[in-house]
UniProtKB/Swiss-Prot annotation:
This is Lactobacillus shifted protein. Residues 28-56, 182-213 are annotated as: Disordered. Gene3D superfamilies: q5lls5 like domains. It comes from the Eukaryota. The gene is lbsA.
Length: 213
């Protein structure tokens, strides 16, 4: 009498185990495809700015003047990644035109929105830091505006920028070779530009080496 009952319980238990084993949390998931397929007939980009922005609107005391913006100026600000750069400059960035789209931004005054300047052009105005060691360190000056300290190899005849802040480094032994090249991505000597950071500047207290030049 007990044999059929035991068999039924074993069968029910085995089915539960099999169903549980079919699901696993370690199965790799499909990640987002970063490379988009080629579209032979791409759709033209449509403006996302409403023509009503050209109509003056009372700012209700927030500004001295009325809120007003032409559609051409608003569309130009909306599609620019930064005031001094049109496109993206990093692989993990998304175009600003894709982010600021939809009904939410149709009646938004674009020139009043935060638009920070891109520092990628400013960092290329920093002169090369000539060093005598094959391995130097950089922490961006330390403090709240710095970055984790990393080590940079300067043994090759090339300008090596810091992976965090972009400050350029090169070995003193390769100075003549780098100066003989027709072009350079960084100034080889100080040019006196206002954007240059003083090489004697030290943010990290008691820092040694080349944390912030």
């Amino acid at each position: 009498m007990l044999l059929p009952t035991v068999r039924s319980r074993i069968a029910a238990l085995s089915s539960r185990v099999a169903s549980r084993a079919a699901y696993s949390t370690t199965v790799p998931r499909f990640t987002e495809n970063a490379m988009q397929p080629n579209d032979p007939t791409p759709r033209p980009a449509k403006p996302n700015v409403s023509e009503t922005d050209a109509t003056p609107v009372d700012s209700m005391g927030a500004w001295d003047a009325a809120l007003q913006e032409s559609t051409d100026a608003a569309e130009r600000v909306r599609t620019m990644q930064a005031p001094n750069r049109k496109g993206t400059w990093a692989s993990n960035q998304k175009p600003r035109a894709e982010a600021m789209s939809g009904p939410r931004f149709e009646q938004t005054i674009m020139h009043l929105q935060p638009t920070p300047m891109a520092a990628i052009e400013l960092i290329h105005k920093q002169p090369v830091r000539w060093v005598k060691d094959k391995i130097v360190s950089c922490d961006g000056g330390g403090g709240p505006l710095g970055h984790p300290r990393i080590f940079i190899n300067t043994d090759k005849p090339e300008i090596v920028p810091c992976g965090y802040c972009g400050l350029p480094f090169a070995h003193e032994h390769h100075r003549e070779y780098l100066k003989s090249l027709p072009t350079s991505s960084y100034p080889l000597e100080p040019t006196g530009a206002a954007e240059e950071v003083n090489e004697n500047q030290r943010v990290t207290e008691g820092a040694t080496g080349y944390e912030q030049r």
